[in-house]
Amino acid sequence: MKSVAFFLMVLCALIIGSVSWETRASNLARKQSAVTNFDRAVVLHGVTLQKGEYLFVHDDAAMQRGEACTYVYEGNAPIAKKLVVSFHCVPIERAKAKQFIIRSVETSPGVTELQEFQFAGDTESHAVPTSIDQHLNVKK
């Protein structure tokens, strides 16, 4: 009887352990995306995004590797030739967002600078690095 109980405990531990590994692996591979529309020009990491629709994509696996993890495309699809800017974001814990949020500040009259963005349902916000040299890739 003791050996059966021990076997069941070991089996449960293995099952629980494997589930947590799968969850951790799926979080690393997670990609999030959202489309937003700007009604005026916005500066993002030194690049001016003109009025229009943009796709924001965040790749958690790239972030874990220290690579550029944020990609912003003109339009609503991740088309390479429509890539406007990519960079390695700075994660910030925030309250859970009910919708996709853009946080920006007016740096001078008529100039709005995007400082961070947060996906719906997430508690992690993605801040834009303050240095233009931090993991930047700009397509002009």
Segments the model singles out, each with a brief description of its role:
Residues 1-9:
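Bacterial N-terminal signal peptides that target proteins for export
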Residues 107-140:
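C-terminal partner/receptor-binding element of secreted or periplasmic proteins
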Residues 43-44, 73:
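A general beta-strand register signal
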Residues 24-43:
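Short acidic, Pro/Gly- and aromatic-enriched capping/linker segments at domain boundaries
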Residues 8-18:
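Bacterial N-terminal signal peptides
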Residues 64-113:
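Mid-chain, structured segments of secreted extracytoplasmic proteins
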Residues 52-56:
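A short tyrosine-centered beta-strand micro-motif
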